[in-house]
A protein has these predicted regions:
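Gly/Ala-rich beta-loop-alpha elbow adjacent to hydrolase catalytic centers
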Residues: 98-103, 107
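Flexible "cap/lid" loop of the alpha/beta hydrolase fold
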Residues: 116-152, 192-199
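Conserved alpha/beta-hydrolase "acid-adjacent" motif
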Residues: 226-235
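Conserved acidic catalytic loop of the alpha/beta-hydrolase fold
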Residues: 78-95
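Short beta-strand/loop motif that positions the catalytic acidic residue
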Residues: 213, 219-221, 225
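Catalytic active-site module of serine/aspartate enzymes centered on a nucleophile-bearing elbow/loop
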Residues: 2, 246-280
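Active-site glycine-rich loops that stabilize anionic/oxyanionic intermediates
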Residues: 28-31, 101, 223-224
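Short, surface-exposed "cap/lid" segments of acyl-processing enzymes
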Residues: 16-64
């Protein structure tokens, strides 16, 4: 368990000791594992053992993250995917996996390895082979991509950038509150990895959508998401639905990229829980 944080190890040990089916939650860029806490409480009450997985070197709190933003720099999709596989590898039971944004991409990578009992990908970042690139997504990622040096940096969004890419479907007051409560810096590198994936034969954003052991998969798409517009989630679904496992798409009207943390989080969480209950 050398690569697993003390916080993750504590949750893994509790899951193994209790014998309940684990649910591994994977956050994406600009959030921490703690952003899943309300989801974790809901799944815990439903009889599951939540594991709030972290990206390598993640600080414990938003305050710590803001005090040391450079700790996020340089993390890659491959590193994080392998880390999640390490976390799952020390669980006694095959878990369900829930991920958002780049966490949703990584959740699909994990599922493609055959180590997830059921997978939920909420507005997932595109994996290699997902071709649509809407203008809204280009604008949402511009704070990173406009400077090639951001490949090796951690990038913090301004409130206006967060409002456009994440919180465009909520009112300005809620957008401000979400930024203050949840937003932290994020590595720029995963954005660049996704941007050039279709030109890179060895792209770390690849997903094995054909593996018959992938298991059931639910993909969410928020109608108003600027960071991952519906065209991208729909394209991921079309590639995944050829898998022999159950593959479903949940369309969420009037929802943006903040749908797992904003005031409407419970609707998404309840649908995710219903799906997981069917298979894990």
């Amino acid at each position: 368990m050398a690569t697993i944080s003390e916080r993750e190890a504590t949750q893994v040990e509790a899951a193994n000791a209790g014998g309940r089916t684990p649910v591994v939650f994977i956050h994406g860029l600009w959030l921490l594992a703690s952003s899943w806490q309300r989801w974790a409480d809901l799944f815990d009450q439903a009889g599951y053992a939540p594991v709030l997985a972290e990206w390598p070197d993640d600080p414990a709190t938003v305050e710590e993250a803001r005090a040391n933003p450079d700790v996020f720099a340089g993390k890659t999709v491959g590193q994080v995917s392998d880390h999640m596989a390490d976390v799952i590898g020390v669980l006694n039971k095959k878990p369900a996996v829930v991920g958002h944004s780049f966490g949703g991409l990584i959740a699909q990578n994990v599922a493609g390895r055959g180590i997830s009992a059921a997978t939920v990908a909420v507005d997932p970042a595109p994996f290699k082979g997902v071709l649509p690139l809407p203008i809204a997504a280009l604008r949402a990622t511009l704070p990173v991509t406009r400077n090639p040096l951001n490949r090796g940096r951690a990038v913090t969004l301004t409130p206006d950038q967060f409002r456009y890419g994440w919180a465009n479907a909520v009112d300005p007051e809620e957008a401000k509150a979400l930024y203050e409560e949840f937003h932290v810096a994020a590595p720029g590198l995963p954005i660049f990895q996704a941007a050039i994936a279709n030109l890179n034969p060895g792209a770390e954003t690849r997903v094995d959508a054909k593996n018959p052991d992938r298991g059931p998969l639910l993909i969410f798409t928020g109608e108003k998401d600027h960071a991952v517009p519906p065209a991208m989630s729909n394209a991921a679904y079309k590639k995944q639905k050829h898998n022999p496992g159950v593959t479903e798409l949940a369309e969420m009207p009037n929802r943006g990229h903040s749908l797992i943390i904003d005031s409407g989080w419970r609707e998404v969480a309840d649908k995710s829980l219903e799906f997981v209950k069917r298979f894990a």
